[in-house]
């Protein structure tokens, strides 16, 4: 299996304490999603991997709904940390505001959901 040099960097970053959203951006079809799937396959952190490919651009609420799903799964698994990965996030209108709102809510409530966003 081919691993990009960024593989080890991302693998390391998701094990660090939650303090930054990890953003992976680049041209289409260069292997961003594949690399993240490889990292997740080697990680022991419970995760939810989603894609916004088929989400209507105006459905900004989808981000909050998926974040709630991640919170529920984290609670159900009684996990100390959880990883939410959203691929193609740039396809959703006002995605950055929605992500910031949920990130800030988790920061305030001391919820340990780490986030990886992918987009072109």
Task: Please place each PLM-identified region on the residue numbering.
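Phosphate-binding site recognition
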Residues: 1-120
């Amino acid at each position: 299996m081919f691993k990009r040099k960024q593989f080890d960097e991302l693998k390391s970053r998701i094990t660090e304490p939650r303090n930054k959203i990890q953003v992976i951006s680049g041209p289409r079809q260069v292997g961003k999603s594949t690399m993240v799937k490889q990292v997740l396959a080697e990680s022991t952190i419970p995760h939810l991997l989603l894609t916004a490919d088929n989400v209507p651009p105006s459905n900004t609420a989808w981000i909050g709904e998926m974040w709630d799903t991640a919170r529920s799964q984290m609670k159900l698994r009684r996990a100390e940390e959880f990883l939410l990965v959203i691929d193609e996030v740039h396809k959703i209108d006002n995605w950055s505001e929605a992500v910031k709102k949920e990130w800030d809510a988790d920061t305030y409530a001391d919820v340990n959901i780490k986030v990886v966003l992918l987009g072109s």
